Amino acid sequence: MFLIYLFVQTAESSWLSKTAKKLENSAKKRISEGIAIAIQGGPRRRRFVAEQDAIHSRVSREVPTLSDSV
């Protein structure tokens, strides 16, 4: 029973360390890409932000103007 516990513990810690390393590498890659874009002077990329035109057209349809309410 103890040997099975040790085996599972080793496998789990190995998986956790690999996952943590992947997350760390992903974060480093995103940071380096952001620095490269900033140095080149390009536009900043934002993650998970809706298109501004889509928001603007939706707001203009939903919000009544003053002439509509009079």
UniProtKB/Swiss-Prot annotation:
Assigned keywords, A-Z: Antibiotic, Antimicrobial, Secreted, Signal
Entry's induction text: By bacterial infection.
Gene Ontology biological process terms, A to Z: antibacterial humoral response; antimicrobial peptide secretion; defense response to bacterium
Residue positions assigned to the propeptide: 45-70
Tissue-by-tissue expression: Expressed in the body wall, intestine, uterus and ovary.
Any one Pfam family match given in the protein's UniProt record, by short name: Cecropin
Signal peptide bounds: 1-13
Cellular component aspect of the GO annotation: extracellular region
The organism's place on the tree of life at top rank: Eukaryota
Cellular compartment(s): Secreted
InterPro entries the record matches: Cecropin
Task of the protein: Has antibacterial activity against several Gram-positive and Gram-negative bacteria. Is weakly active against yeasts. Acts by a nonpore mechanism.
Family from the record: Belongs to the cecropin family.
Listed name of the protein: Cecropin-P1
Natural source organism: Ascaris suum
Gene: ASCEC-1
